[in-house]
Amino acid sequence: MPTIQQLIRKPREPKRVRSKSQHLESCPQKRGVCTRVYTTTPKKPNSAMRKVAKVRLTNGFEVISYIPGEKHNLQEHSVVLIRGGRVKDLPGVRYHILRGVLDTQGVKDRRQRRSKYGAKRPK
């Protein structure tokens, strides 16, 4: 335990808070190109085939991001926009792909929470 004199000479340094989405480099979204689109299975109590894509960002980082909603049109070399936000039951997936932006189509026949899935207003 330091003495008061030592604390006056060199005060305590606050712990630095690390960002949970570091590869975005403090940007709200980042553009990238899909290098691989595949499905993966979630952690223990859950069971599904979750759609994910490996994306090379414009800053050179490669990240795994989740494709939300039913059905998608993504394939290799698709240009996508990603945002932060992890998927709790997929280890290593810390980003989401934005639907209805760039090469990603919105979810078809979506009626509720449309803005989250890039769906147009139904007629």
From Swiss-Prot:
PROSITE patterns listed in its UniProt record: RIBOSOMAL_S12
InterPro entries to which the protein is assigned, alphabetical: NA-bd_OB-fold (IPR012340), Ribosomal_uS12 (IPR006032), Ribosomal_uS12_bac (IPR005679)
Pfam families registered for this protein in UniProt: Ribosom_S12_S23
GO cellular component: small ribosomal subunit
Region Disordered: start-end pairs: 1-28
Gene3D superfamilies linked to this entry: Nucleic acid-binding proteins (2.40.50.140)
Domain of life: Bacteria
CDD domains, alphabetized: Ribosomal_S12
Modified sites of kind 3-methylthioaspartic acid: 89
Molecular function GO labels: rRNA binding; structural constituent of ribosome; tRNA binding
GO biological process: translation
Record keywords: Methylation, Ribonucleoprotein, Ribosomal protein, RNA-binding, rRNA-binding, tRNA-binding
NCBIfam families, sorted: rpsL_bact (TIGR00981)
Function: With S4 and S5 plays an important role in translational accuracy.
Family membership: Belongs to the universal ribosomal protein uS12 family.
Assembly description: Part of the 30S ribosomal subunit. Contacts proteins S8 and S17. May interact with IF1 in the 30S initiation complex.
Protein name per Swiss-Prot or TrEMBL: Small ribosomal subunit protein uS12
Species name: Cereibacter sphaeroides (strain ATCC 17023 / DSM 158 / JCM 6121 / CCUG 31486 / LMG 2827 / NBRC 12203 / NCIMB 8253 / ATH 2.4.1.)
Lineage of producing organism: Bacteria, Pseudomonadati, Pseudomonadota, Alphaproteobacteria, Rhodobacterales
Gene behind this protein: rpsL
